[in-house]
Amino acid sequence: MYQAMEVESTSPSGFFLDFYTQSTIPTTDFLNNTNSSHPIRDEKLVKIEIAVLGTCFTLAIINNLCVLLVLLWRRKKVRRMQMFILHLSIADLIVAFFNILPQLIWDITFRFMAGDAMCRFIKYAQMFSLYLSTYILIMTAVDRYRAICHPLSNQTWTPCMVYCKIFIAYAIATIFSIPQAILFQMQEVNEGSGIYDCWVHFEPAWVLTAYALYIFFALYLIPILILFFTYGSICYTIWAKYRHAIKTKKDANTRYPQRRKKKGVILRTHSVHGFSKAKLNSVKLTFAVIVTYIICWSPFFVSQIWWLFDETVVGNAGVVVILLMACLNSCTNPWIYLIFNRNYISNVLPCKCLRRHRVEVAATTETERLSLGSVRRDSRKTSDPKRISESRRISDARRISGKTQKNNSSSPRKTSDQFIYSDKTT
């Protein structure tokens, strides 16, 4: 979130700047009169901020609770990828309750109404939630990187490894948020004004630039570089294996041209060029979450760097609206997960007719799977001459054996009947 902070400059009077200290929206406190010691807000813009914050808070709570409900409903079958999604939803809920909600209340009251301890805690929690959400996303990308690029080492994974990565994300968020609790405190907005707020005075002025760059590197640039490396490696590995599979297929067709004449051969559907569909789906899911993260946060950090070199951007309504995109990230992550896992949504549908439809779809899928397996077996039998001759030989042998057994079993019965008939006639 953002809160206006005063920076002591060389000019006679101080001025208020919007600066990123939370997870979503900056407040619009600024001086209309440079000779005034009290900031005046743009109330129209504040109302827009409050409306957007309230909407984002509601959507973040509802959407992430839906994801948690789906995952907890399937808690006995939760896979490693879903564990990361579970904690990402928890992080987004922390963003909603400890970042968006305090900022919403703060915008309504204009001044922070709690004490110094609560001021430091809220500021710490706001940054903690942001770091946690970001670094859980990074650990998810690292896990997909190991699964795709290093499959042999990935074979030995245990649930403990997943929990270790999640613990690392929590530890990084805990440590990186400490400066926020040190800098902010309840103090006078302007010395001698008698107005107290959860505030920070950056003295000298270069401390503000240093802290802004610290947040930029820790929360955006370094995570983006890690995400680019992991997904660049994943894309290259998938492309290389796809190319190798195509080359191998061409070589096989060149060496054994008669195989190209086979009919009725159905390819396996649970894997694509050595990767399972579930693994590829998890890669697509993580990639979508990362792209959304970049889209939501890039305008904010670009504006922050711009603000460091151009102070006239402060109070610009257009810039504030652009910065509102950052809070959408906690709302969009659940949508992405549910879109990529539509079959899980039916697990929590309360309507019996919808559940019946789910069962019918599952039965149809199972029938198609079984029929596909039978067709595949039949195609293998009909496409191989050796199998055809072997199956015919076995069936002929069984038919001859059955006739022999029938003749052997029917002969004594016929003889016995003849004896009985002869006895009666005599």
From Swiss-Prot:
PANTHER family per record:
G-PROTEIN COUPLED RECEPTORS FAMILY 1 PROFILE DOMAIN-CONTAINING PROTEIN, NEUROPEPTIDE RECEPTOR-RELATED G-PROTEIN COUPLED RECEPTOR
The organism's taxonomy opens as:
Eukaryota, Metazoa, Spiralia, Lophotrochozoa, Mollusca
Function per UniProt: Acts as a receptor for cephalotocin.
- The glycosylation sites annotated in the UniProt record are 32, 35
Specify the protein name: Cephalotocin receptor 2
- Gene this protein is translated from: CTR2
Tissues expressing this chain: Present in various peripheral tissues with highest expression in branchia and vas deferens. Very low expression detected in nervous system.
- Per UniProt, the ranges with Polar residues bias are 402-426
Provide the GO MF annotations for this entry: peptide binding; protein-hormone receptor activity; vasopressin receptor activity
The GO annotation for biological process reads: cellular response to hormone stimulus; G protein-coupled receptor signaling pathway; positive regulation of hormone secretion
Q: Cellular location of this protein?
A: Cell membrane
InterPro entries reported in the protein's UniProt record: GPCR_Rhodpsn (IPR000276), GPCR_Rhodpsn_7TM (IPR017452), Vasoprsn_rcpt (IPR001817)
Q: Where is this protein chiefly located?
A: membrane
- Topology relative to the membrane: Multi-pass membrane protein
The entry sums up its family as follows: Belongs to the G-protein coupled receptor 1 family. Vasopressin/oxytocin receptor subfamily.
